[in-house]
UniProtKB/Swiss-Prot annotation:
Gene3D superfamilies: 1.10.287.70, Helix hairpin bin, Jelly Rolls. This is Cyclic nucleotide-gated channel beta-1. It holds the Pfam family cNMP_binding. Residues 633-643 are annotated as: Calmodulin-binding CaM1. The keyword Transcription regulation does not apply.
């Protein structure tokens, strides 16, 4: 009858339907209302309902948005074998059986039966009326055609409780499984009212056929099937609000896409029956169930695929918390309407508000999950969402490509700007190119690193989030009691990638913690500070918001910000929400003005906050980062301000100095005077290396003997050099000496051995030994020395071994050396030992000439060697002539004629004597008689005349060159004497001139050094001047502290002049144009009233005349007479030359002027000199004597001794007046002399005093006062004895000295005159 319904209703495609029934029936009992456990929030929505084609009496309201559906299973009769509907577990009643189920996928927890609930379970009563039988028949017929769900746990048998036929025939199946024993019991009681059965049947079938909304993401594959809402306990803000409906209908069960990996969970029991006998609550329950069945708004998440039907029947099912497939890396948080947000907050069951707790929680929880099957519509929507996500990924990729293009355009613009700068600055082109290449390489590396970091972050940040809704109920089960079920292990095996990613994340976090302990401590402190008010607990979970686009592409190619480190997971919950970072670039964009401080800011303000929200500029983490950047910028600005203040101070000081210089350019402070920079010491080697080196040196330089220990030079100093300098190497000249000796052996003895019979069989070995020794020397010279001689090529000295060898092999000397070493000695075997075969050894004459040149270059008196060499030439010519004469005599016959040698005496000496007489043409020789003798004699004469004429002329040249200087000196002296005689110069002056010539010639070896210096370049003149004069000039106190180069320039301008004894170097009053430095000898500075007193004597190294030369003090006249004491050699520096030098050294000029001012000021200061006393110093007068003297003065002439004391007082008065007059006269004489010699020049030497100008007396001496005070002020010496006189008058004596002060010729001068009255004095005595 109802078969057409089955054909019309939609069936799930390709879904196998299985029915598993329990073998033993179980009677249904009426369930009592029990308290339901507190549900956890569900992040899931129910599928949209679809209109049912079958007519129903109940009207369907319009779909209303419901944030959280609460499905509950309905009990169904046994007569529906194709499909079985699952009932939720109910609270156990007294006396009822308990159904057991395995532990859940993640954790099995025990539900608390004592928790309160706002929903009561409805018991199903028995129905015995006929209407109930009719309804049960209609119900069984509808279940045959309506698809039924299957229990998600296919491997578990289902238990169903059957009703007796006499009670209505309807059977209510028992739940598939329950939690722990005693936690839940399934009671299947039959409803007594048929209307309730009809309503339940309509509700159940509507939920089956209507489409359900998909879950937010594909990571959850199944949904909970039923839930009972309880009031939210305090402290759990994320749980749902309680609902008023007592029970809720159950939508069609959903089947997981891949496999039912769920296990039954305890703790959730509910009845889907409506409340009996309460029409108001019945209407509310119906409306609530319809709202749950109607379609709901869908979030942008991917739901798991579901199928409409599944065979089998199960009341309580569980789902796997671990995701089966990961499609997205992160959740996407998007903006929603305010009305929807309010509804979500009111219902408390929005999937966006709830997140899945991690696998390990500190608080014990019982998680019960009821799976739901997906419909075909959900699969289609799932595919659409996948396509949407792919489109979003493509858009992201396009955005990244656009960003890369923009970066490339920026790089191109930068390159253009750099090219413009290169055109302006051509000198810096190479450096800029290198910098550009380095920047490009760094950018490429940065991009590669960013891509790698992005991939790693994507892998690391793939959250293992469970997107299927579930109900979480707390229980009193510890974590140690939890175990994993086989279904959970199966689900874990299906996800190896997630496990590997977890392990990689853990390893990376461990490594980061080990490497950056300090940073982690700071981060923990910051995290504690931020979470101090609200700790991360279940009531206040820790939320981390990350930017999905922050690391998708490089924002700025110049910067590479380190990715934010992932914080360690919270002990309660660590959920991650990903926010699209559209505006992230704006926060990290580097401004053009920040180029200088970008790296500092990047290094000082990294992203260290554990919670990062790039899209929200008002987050406390970003505000903290901005504060850090601001603090860094403030530090940099403070440093810059300090530096600017320092620069301002320096500029002010410099301005003040310039003003002072403009006002008085000569006045400088001591601080401005340049100080010689201390010579930098060479860096000392490490102390650890010093002992080792010292030990090695000791081992090399010292040798221990039995008696003593002596030092020797290291052996490495005797190693043969790689190259030899033929011009300066003395060892090479010594080697040439040995080569010349070997050459002379051959040249002198080969003719002797050939002509004279000195080579015999008994001494042949001696001759051969010497011959081969000379050959060995020749061979060494060719192979060792000549191959290592340096030479000049293109102005460079070539020291390369190959180049030196090639140069010698190509030279003419090598050819001559080869000829001289021709091995003609092998002919001895055939021709006998003939000395003429060694004649080619004489071809090494080039070594002889080279030796002469090198030796003359190093000899101080080369003319001596030249004379010796010329004499040797003459002797060698005589040697050859004597050998030829003996050979001619032997050819004619010894003693055959008077002309030949007669064989008497030493043959060589007699022949040499004959050769000397013949070549010199002395005469007295016997006349030749034969034609051979006549020709031989003619050749001797011609050779003698030519040889001796050349020799004599060469000898004259040698001697003339040796005496050329003396000749020049004589010619100059003769010319000077002739000049003085012509002008009739006095003889005394002529003698002084002659003395000067002789002393100058003997002391210097020449009359004028400048003539020799003119031919030399400036560098050589400077070198010579430094060696000769620097040691003296550097000791001058005036030039100490001056520029070293200025002293070098001054050395080249110095002239050497010799002064004879008592010659005036300079006279007082002359114009000073020269400064003098004493090289040798002494000078005396004269002064005093007559100008002949020797004030000081200056020695070598002293300088004088500098005050006039520097023109300090307003004049440049000489202030004293300077006379040479003996022969004195002085260096003279002209004022013009000094000014030309000081122009280039302004600092030294200021220093010299300052020193000259100081010297002049010191010379003008008077020195306190002790006055010459006329009377010797007297001892102090005793107090008793002074008292007696005063008393006697008061008594007057009445006292017995009054006359004697009065006479003594008068005498002391006279002596004091004489002493004062003498002192005043001396002061006047010194004042007059100082005025005449005012401004006298002082020497720069420390021991050089200058004429002092004593100060004039401020107050002229006054005439003595009354006798009594003067007598008291100047008492007589203790040793003085009063003279006794019997005829002395009684009255006071008259004064014997008169002192008068009269005005002088000048208005400011006074004349002091002293008169002594001799007559009165004599009469008094």
């Amino acid at each position: 009858m109802l078969g057409w319904v089955q054909r019309v209703l939609p069936q799930p495609p390709g879904t196998p339907q299985k029915t598993v029934e329990t073998a033993g029936p179980q009677p249904e009992t009426e369930s009592k209302p029990e308290a339901n456990p507190q549900p956890e929030p569900e992040p899931q929505q129910e599928p949209e309902p679809e209109p049912e084609p079958e007519p129903e009496p109940e009207p369907e309201p319009e779909p209303e948005p419901e944030p959280e559906p609460e499905p509950e299973p309905e009990p169904v009769p046994e007569e529906a074998p194709p499909e079985v509907q699952a009932l939720p577990p109910e609270e156990p009643m007294e006396g009822e059986g308990e159904a057991e189920a395995g532990p859940s996928l993640q954790e099995t927890q025990v539900a608390d039966p004592a928790q309160p609930t706002s929903q009561a379970q409805v018991a199903v009563a028995k129905v015995n009326r006929p209407s109930s039988w009719m309804l049960s028949w209609f119900w069984r017929g509808m279940q045959k055609v309506v698809p039924q769900p299957v229990c998600s746990n296919g491997g578990q048998n289902l238990a169903a409780g059957e009703r007796d036929p006499d009670q209505g025939g309807a059977q209510i199946p028992e739940p598939c499984g329950t939690g722990d024993p005693g936690s839940a019991e399934a009671s299947g009681t039959q409803d007594t009212e048929p209307s309730l059965w009809l309503l339940r049947w309509l509700e159940q079938n509507l939920e089956k056929v209507l489409p359900q909304p998909p879950p937010p993401s594909l990571a959850w594959k199944v949904e909970p099937e039923a839930a009972v809402l309880d009031p939210d306990p305090p402290g759990t803000p994320m749980q749902m609000e309680p609902t008023e409906s007592p029970s809720q209908p159950n939508p069609g069960p959903l089947e997981p896409e891949e496999e039912p990996a769920a296990e039954p969970q305890p703790g959730f029991q509910s009845s889907s029956l409506p409340p009996p006998g309460d029409p108001v609550r019945l209407i509310e329950w119906l409306l609530h169930r319809l709202e749950m069945a109607l379609p709901q708004p869908v979030l942008h998440g991917k739901a798991a695929e579901q199928e409409p039907g599944c065979p089998g029947m199960c009341d309580v099912q569980t789902i796997s918390i671990l995701p089966v497939e990961q499609v997205e890396h992160d959740l996407v948080l998007e903006e929603v309407d305010s009305c929807w947000e309010d509804a979500q907050q009111e219902d408390g069951a929005s999937p966006q508000e709830t997140e899945v707790a991690p696998a390990h929680e500190e608080e014990s929880e019982a998680i019960v999950e009821i799976p739901r099957e997906l419909t075909k519509i959900q699969e289609e929507r799932e595919d659409e969402q996948e396509e949407d996500e792919e489109e979003k990924e493509e858009e992201k990729k396009k955005g990244e490509e656009e960003k890369e293009k923009e970066e490339e355009e920026k790089e191109k613009e930068k390159e253009k700007e750099e090219e413009k700068e290169e055109e302006e600055k051509e000198e810096e082109e190479e450096e800029e190119k290198e910098e550009e290449e380095e920047e490009k390489e760094e950018e490429e590396k940065e991009e590669e690193e960013k891509e790698e970091e992005e991939e790693e972050e994507e892998e690391e940040e793939e959250p293992i989030v469970l997107l299927d809704s579930c109900l979480v109920v707390q229980a009193d089960v510890d974590e140690c009691q939890l175990e994993r079920t086989p279904s959970e292990l199966a689900s874990i095996q299906e996800l190896p990638e997630e496990k590997e990613e977890k392990e990689e994340e853990k390893e990376e976090e461990k490594e980061e913690e080990e490497e950056k302990k300090e940073e982690e401590v700071e981060k923990k402190e910051e995290g504690e500070a931020t979470n101090s008010t609200v700790p991360a607990t279940k009531e206040h979970p820790e939320l981390q918001v990350e930017d999905t686009d922050a690391d998708s592409g490089p924002l700025i190619p110049e910067e590479t910000l380190p990715p934010p480190e992932r914080p360690p997971p919270s002990p309660v919950k660590s959920d991650t929400l990903t926010v699209p970072g559209a505006a992230a670039a704006g926060h990290r964009k580097k401004l053009p003005s920040q180029d200088d401080e970008a790296e500092e800011l990047k290094a000082l303000s990294p992203a260290e906050s554990p919670v990062v929200a790039w899209s929200d500029p008002t987050t406390p983490q970003e505000a903290d980062g901005q504060d850090r950047a601001a603090s860094t910028a403030s530090q940099n600005s403070a440093i810059i301000n300090d530096r600017l203040q320092e620069l301002v101070k320096m500029f002010k000081e410099r301005t003040e100095k310039v003003k002072e210089k403009l006002i008085d350019p000569d006045v400088t402070s001591d601080e401005e005077s340049p100080k010689p920079s201390p010579a930098k010491k060479a860096p000392e080697p490490d102390p650890a290396q010093k002992p080792a080196e010292a030990e090695v040196a000791e081992e090399e330089h010292y040798c221990d003997m039995l008696c003593c220990k002596f030092k020797r030079r290291p052996l490495k100093m005797y190693r043969f050099p790689q190259s030899i300098d033929p011009l300066t190497n003395l060892m090479y000249i010594l080697w040439l000496f040995f080569v010349v000796l070997a050459w002379n052996w051959n040249c002198w003895l080969i003719p002797v051995r050939w002509a004279f019979p000195y080579q015999r069989a008994d001494n042949i070995h001696f001759w051969l030994l010497m011959d081969y020794l000379c050959d060995f020397i020749y061979l060494l010279d060719i192979t060792v020395f000549q191959m290592r001689l340096q030479f000049v090529k293109g102005g460079d000295i070539i020291t390369d071994k190959k180049e030196m060898r090639n140069n010698y092999l190509k030279s003419r000397r090598f050819k001559m050396d080869l000829l001289c070493l021709l091995p003609l000695d092998f002919l001895y075997l055939k021709l006998g030992i003939n000395p003429l075969l060694r004649l080619p050894r004489c071809l090494k004459y080039m070594a002889f000439f080279e030796f002469n040149n090198r030796l003359e270059a190093i000899l101080s008196k080369a003319y001596v060697y030249r004379v010796i060499r010329t004499t040797a030439y003459l002797l060698y010519s005589l040697h050859l002539n004597s050998c030829l004469y003996y050979w001619a005599s032997a050819f004619q016959g010894i003693g055959s004629t008077h002309w030949v040698y007669d064989g008497v005496g030493n043959s060589y000496i007699r022949c040499y004597y004959w050769a000397v007489k013949t070549l010199i043409t002395i005469g007295g020789l016997p006349d030749p008689q034969t034609l051979f003798e006549i020709v031989f004699q003619l050749l001797n004469y011609f050779t003698g005349v030519f040889a001796f004429s050349v020799m004599i002329g060469q000898m004259r040249d040698v001697v003339g060159a040796a005496t050329a200087g003396q000749t020049y000196y004589r010619s100059c002296m003769d010319s000077t004497v002739k000049y003085m005689n012509f002008y009739k110069i006095p003889r005394s002056v002529q003698n002084r001139v002659k003395t000067w010539y002789e002393y100058t010639w003997h002391s210097q070896g020449m009359l004028d050094e400048s003539e020799l210096m003119v031919q030399l370049p400036d560098k050589m003149r400077l070198d010579l001047a430094i060696d000769v004069n620097y040691s003296i000039v550097s000791k001058v106190a005036l030039f100490q502290g001056c520029d070293r180069q200025m002293i070098f320039d001054m050395l080249k301008r110095l002239r050497s002049v010799v002064y004879l004894p008592n010659d005036y170097v300079c006279k007082k009053g002359e114009i000073g144009r020269e400064m003098y430095i004493i090289q040798a000898g002494q000078v005396q500075v004269l002064g005093g009233p007559d100008g002949k007193a020797v004030l000081v004597t200056l020695k070598a190294g002293s300088v004088f005349g500098e005050i006039s030369l520097l023109a300090v003090g307003g004049g440049n006249r000489r202030t004293a007479n300077v006379v040479a004491h003996g022969f004195t050699n002085l260096f003279i520096l002209d004022k013009k030359d000094l000014n030309e030098i000081l122009v280039h050294y302004p600092e030294s000029q200021k220093l010299l002027r300052k020193k000259a001012r100081r010297m002049l000021r010191n010379n003008n200061k008077p020195k306190e000199e002790k006055s010459v006393l006329i009377l010797p110093p007297r001892a102090g007068t005793p107090k008793l004597f002074n008292a007696a003297l005063a008393a006697a003065g008061k008594m007057g002439p009445r006292g017995a001794k009054g006359g004697k004391l009065a006479h003594l007082r008068a005498r002391l008065k006279e002596l004091a007046a004489l002493e004062a007059a003498a002192r005043q006269q001396q002061l006047l004489e010194q004042a007059k002399s100082s005025q005449e010699a005012g401004g006298e020049e002082g020497s720069g030497a420390t021991d050089q005093p200058a004429p002092q100008e004593p100060p004039e007396p401020k107050d002229p001496p006054k005439p003595p006062g009354p006798p009594e005070p003067s007598a008291q002020s100047s008492p007589p010496p203790a040793s003085a004895k009063p003279e006794e006189s019997t005829g002395e008058a009684a009255g006071p004596p008259e004064p014997s000295v008169r002192i008068r002060v009269s005005p002088g010729p000048d208005p400011g001068e006074q004349t002091l005159s002293v008169e002594v009255l001799e007559e009165k004095k004599e009469g008094a005595e």
